Design a protein with these regions (language model features):
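Extracellular "spike/adhesin" assembly and maturation modules
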Residues: 1-62, 67, 74, 86-147
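Basic/aromatic-rich interaction segments and small domains that mediate binding to polyanionic partners
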Residues: 76-80, 84
Length: 147
């Protein structure tokens, strides 16, 4: 096996020369992916002034340095862009949109927003306050968006 099964991180081999290069490449990927978040979903890296370690989900119509990497995770490193293919079921927080995105194996999507409670024939103030607090906590954690 030359790479790991989930994120295609390079593996060391017996008698391999310059093992530190392979090891460092894997560490760059681990460092970015363990964060569990990306800056945003974008198609064009041109306007960015990225710092090493920052990551983005490449949109469906990439241009420039991201051409051919639609749906992948673009990671900025000292050596340029690195691209990781997400396994089905992976979830990342999109910091710009403040939502959690999930990869289903072919595309990224955000969880649908939860409607805030309204109406009803009997209003229970304590129940509404508790539900509002739960929804606020989920939203703050990036697990839900409330409309």
């Amino acid at each position: 096996m030359s790479s790991t099964p989930n994120f295609s991180m390079p593996m060391l081999h017996a008698a391999q020369a310059q093992k530190e290069i392979t090891h460092n490449e894997a560490l760059v990927l681990v460092d970015a992916l363990l964060r569990g978040a990306v800056n945003a979903v974008l198609n064009d890296p041109a306007p960015l002034a990225p710092a090493p370690g920052q990551a983005w989900i490449v949109g469906p119509a990439p241009v420039g340095a991201w051409v051919g990497h639609a749906g992948k995770i673009a990671i900025c490193s000292d050596g340029g862009w690195r691209f990781a293919t997400a396994p089905a079921g992976m979830q990342l927080r999109d910091d710009m949109a403040a939502v959690c995105r999930r990869f289903d194996g072919s595309a990224w999507s955000a969880y649908p927003p939860i409607a805030a409670p309204v109406g009803g024939s009997i209003v229970d103030a304590e129940a509404r306050a508790t539900l509002a607090a739960v929804l606020a906590a989920l939203q703050q954690a990036g697990l839900a968006s409330v409309t």
